[in-house]
Amino acid sequence: MYDTIVVLDFGSQYSQLITRRVREAQVYCEMFPWNVDAARVMAMQPRGFILSGGPNSIYAPGAPQLPAFVLESGLPVLGICYGMQALTRALGGVVAASSEGEYGLAQIETLLPNPLLPPGIQPVWMSHGDRIESLPT
């Protein structure tokens, strides 16, 4: 049996790239739309989830929401952009509209050792109009 990561697509133009990069790391990865049937995903016995970005605001009418089975699974979850906002909101944090959007290159710094990210500063691309105002408690 393979270790499997599931990417849930919230409409990002980069979802295919994310899936491919996971596969290039020698990890089996499948991508599904955010509203996929839970039984279909959980039958794959994934080891974790990646939630993609997307063009919506988390508070827009009809905006995609985090499927309950993701948190109920107890598996590790990586939220990217909209996926992070959906995760934050589902866990009780607050997401708010930014006064202006931010687009372009940025840097993130890994402060604590972890198996997913290398230590130090990494270049990243950002494109968002909402922000995390307060983290879940």
Language model features with spans:
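Short, charged N-terminal beta->alpha structural module
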Residues: 4-25
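Hydrophobic anchor at the start of a short beta-strand
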Residues: 5, 29, 77
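Cofactor-binding loop segments of dinucleotide-utilizing enzymes, especially the Rossmann-like FAD-
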Residues: 8-10, 34, 82
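Cysteine-nucleophile active-site neighborhood
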Residues: 20-26, 43-116, 120-123, 129-132
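Short, intrinsically disordered, charge-balanced linker/junction segments flanking boundaries
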Residues: 135-137
